[in-house]
Amino acid sequence: MNKKNIVIIGGGWYGCHLSMAFIKKGFKVSLFEKNEEIFSEASFYNQNRLHLGFHYPRSYPTRVQSKRGYRLFNSQYADLTSNLDLSLYAIAQNCSLMDLETYKSIIKSSDLKFEDISNSLPFSLKNLAGVINTREKIIDARKAKKFFQNNLKDICTIGTEIIQKDIENFIKDGHTVIDCTWNK
């Protein structure tokens, strides 16, 4: 194997994004994925909603971070996203930690745009104080997979599981190793 500066283990979102980021910064990168394709586990099958922070009404810092991350993601990967006609958030009438008006007030104070569609739902639900529709997006996992496959094909080794001994050898050879696997 040729000497590389950075070894990244895991070909999901984190591994692929970090690989691209380090390459853009001029580093030499080797990406290893244990499966026969990148994006073949959670990064492909997750709901992949790109959210603005609507589901964090009790955490202002998290809403701010979500909005910042949303803008950053769209600046880098806008071609990998699609608009959603419906992106609904509902507040329960009973057993909720927050009432609808407080929720809407908090969301408005964070400058998040939404439409209250509580009275115009095309279906009936019980125990709802209200429903809002937002302008969030979804990440198209098929587009993302193809994008990263095309852009990382020259540095990606698929079908290769990296074990602890491999990591030790990479480090001994002077590589920086970043483990981007899930639940390891």
Predicted regions and their residues:
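Short beta-strand/turn micro-motifs composed of small residues
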Residues: 10, 33, 92
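Glycine-rich FAD pyrophosphate-binding loop
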Residues: 23-45
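Glycine-rich "substrate-gating" loop/helix at the edge of Rossmann-like oxidoreductase active sites
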Residues: 133-138
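Predominantly flavin-linked oxidoreductase catalytic cores and closely associated redox partners
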Residues: 139-184
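Dinucleotide-binding Rossmann-like beta1-alpha1 core, especially the glycine-rich loop
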Residues: 47-130
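N-terminal Rossmann-like FAD-binding beta1-loop-alpha1 element of flavoenzymes
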Residues: 4-30
